[in-house]
Amino acid sequence: MNPIAKKLRQNALFLSHKCQDGNLQSVFSCLDIVWVLYDKIMNWSAAQAKAEYRDFFIISKGQATLALYPVLIEKGLFSMEDVSSHIGQFNSRYCIQTDLTKFPEGGIENNAGSLGHGLPFAVGIAYANKVKKLPSYTYVLCGDGEFCEGTMWESCLFAAGKKLDNLCLIVDDNRSVGAMVDMGNMAQKLAAFGFDVKETDGHNMDALEQTFKELRAVKNNRPKAVIAKTVRGYGSKTMTEKDIWFHKAPNAEELKQLQAEVEAA
């Protein structure tokens, strides 16, 4: 992994250890996606986090909120000292699931928690910006398991029907529900719903950047979708092999072990 991919994972591990909470497998599967969006793709800056013309990032798979804080720390919106000192504490703004009401200055765009709600929220933002004729683009990160929710497919129908080519749905396809529900070919399903779809390696930052740029350049009144092929716990051998890390925070000894694995990856 490149240095920034390692740093983001190290910081996510540290924050999880500090608050003794977090879904680290899910976090590690999407960190590269979130970083590429903020660093290479989105029209967004910490200094203008409330600008009307900004791009929006909606995290629908809220269990991966610990993937968002390290990225926003790197982009200068938060400090590691502030986040690590308060994350997960009672009434803290740094919740394990995002809470936009605690960030009046911007930076967090949605409340997360109930799965299947981020996409309809993102569709509403994209539709409003389309009506206002704003240049804003909306990106929404969803887990593959969220497509068990009917709200996801209802939102896809609406997005295609309203010709929201300012919307990009990103599916973190880490195959977390395959043992329970066969999701089939997600690319074919989304294409049938009227999306322009591309599949890519969700851990290859160059490939992600190219895919996002190619889709954004297409103005054809069709919403976009990226199927990002990912691995749960990517960057840590222990987390990829042991599903207990879906929802487990490291103690001091485990933190050292996992950080060493990330550094060696």
Go through the PLM ranges and name each one.
Residues A5-D21, D172-D173:
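N-terminal capping segment at the start of a domain
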Residues L15, V27-G161:
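Cofactor-binding active-site loop characterized by glycine-rich and histidine/acidic residues
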Residues D55-F57, S136-V140, L167, N220-A228:
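Generic beta-sheet signal
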Residues Y69-V71, T151-W153, A179-M183, G235-E241:
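Short acidic, glycine/serine/threonine-rich loops at helix termini
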Residues E109, G161-K189:
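A short, conserved beta-to-alpha structural element at the edge of catalytic cores
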Residues L134, D182-T211, E263:
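Conserved thiamine diphosphate
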Residues E149-N174, P223-A228:
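A short alpha/beta connector and helix-capping loop motif
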Residues M205, T211-A265:
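Glycine/aspartate-rich loop-and-adjacent alpha/beta segment that forms the canonical ThDP
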